[in-house]
Regions:
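Well-ordered mid-protein domain cores that form the structural environment of catalytic cofactors
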Residues: 1-53
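Short, intrinsically disordered, charge-balanced linker/junction segments flanking boundaries
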Residues: 325-336
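Long alpha-helical segments found as membrane-embedded helices
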Residues: 262-264
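Residue-level recognition of beta-strand termini and adjacent short loop/turns
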Residues: 8, 99, 332-334
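Signature for the C-terminal beta-barrel architecture of outer-membrane proteins
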Residues: 10-12, 40-249, 254, 266-326
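N-terminal polybasic phosphate/anion-binding patch
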Residues: 258
Length: 336
């Protein structure tokens, strides 16, 4: 939940702890609703054709190996979390109505260590300033923080009466154009893309959503897992992490108090070799943002979906299809 204060008709301050979802897609490559609730404070500015959000949040990263069950016996509970390392993140997005049903948005984010360069409980005040660019600020403060950038574009045709929506979203973790042109599969070309179509029937009873997403290996990761784009040992963005391709189709039928939903999700993802809980693999294919990119086995030859190129034992590509459905009935409110 959260607390909000309306400073003016166009400015709102908010703080609390809850999940966030940035974007119009079912999934988000920036911040996804499936992530753990995030302690945060935010500023929102809404004008006629522009909306700006600036968010500061505290992330937590858990280590396996618990404190003793009883302080005097020295035993640990396997599989529980003993160490909790904190980090900070800042994110902002500006969305603009471009006219004729078009909307565009720009996104920026940065994560930084709570303890860095000998400073404990470090809060970088520069990142809390609204309307700044995080990447130049990162260079200015002289710290190797983890920055992300992104953009989105959507179109809701006016003739469709808000029943049709085309939506796209990209995220850039790191990108060198010359390395893309070379075609050598450089590991640090880290990006993701998402596209979706939403359709609602004229009688508003049917709704269809088709969406596809792809994220290259090692996207969202960092040399230190505490600076990765994660919170409480899970991704802040798409729950699959990276090194995957996904397609989904959702259908909903609603009439009076009845609602029926059906969906299917297909995914192909490069997977690391299995390891015990809390044990980081010696080499990684870049699917889990919690694994440091330092443990990559190669710098080149990294495909969009990568199985390790035969350099990692028991690593491979996993493909699966999931179906789901539910039926709901809304009870009328009680009177009296």
């Amino acid at each position: 939940g959260h607390l909000a204060y309306q400073v003016s008709p166009s400015v709102q301050l908010k703080c609390g702890q809850e999940p966030h979802h940035w974007g119009q897609g079912w999934r988000s490559l920036w911040m996804d609703r499936q992530a753990s609730p995030l302690p945060f404070a935010s500023l929102q500015v809404r004008l006629k054709r522009l909306e700006y959000t600036h968010l500061i949040a505290r992330t937590q990263h858990l280590g396996v190996g618990s404190p003793p069950a009883i302080p005097t016996n020295g035993r640990n509970h396997p599989g529980s979390y003993a160490t909790r390392r904190g980090a900070w993140m800042a994110a902002h997005a500006v969305e603009v109505e471009l006219g004729r049903g078009w909307k565009g948005a720009l996104f920026g984010a940065v994560t930084w260590l709570n303890n860095d360069s000998g400073y404990t409980h470090r809060f970088e005040a520069a990142y809390a300033l609204p309307f700044i660019s995080f990447r130049p600020t990162e260079y200015a403060v002289g710290s190797a923080d983890n920055a992300l950038m992104g953009a989105s574009l959507s179109w809701a045709p006016r003739w469709a009466d808000e029943r049709l929506l085309f939506y796209s979203q990209i995220v850039l973790d790191e990108l060198v154009v010359s390395e893309i042109r070379s075609g050598d599969g450089w590991w640090a070309n880290k990006w993701g893309a998402l596209g979706a179509i939403q359709w609602i029937s004229p009688n508003r009873m049917w709704r269809l959503v088709a969406e596809g997403a792809a994220v290259r290996p090692f996207t969202y990761s960092h040399a230190s897992n505490v600076q990765s784009w994660t919170h409480r040992n899970g991704p802040l963005a798409h729950p699959a992490g990276s090194n995957f391709i996904e397609g989904r189709l959702h259908m909903q039928w609603k009439r009076n108090d009845w609602k029926v939903r059906l969906g299917c999700v297909w995914m192909q993802q490069g997977m690391d070799e299995p390891t015990p809980l809390g044990v980081t693999p010696n080499l990684t294919v870049g699917a889990d943002p919690l694994n440091s990119y330092i443990t990559r086995p190669a710098d080149y030859g990294i495909d969009l979906i990568w199985d390790g190129g035969g350099l990692i034992d028991q690593a491979g590509i996993q493909e699966n299809m999931r179906w789901w459905g539910d039926i709901a009935f809304s009870l009328p409110p009680l009177e009296g």
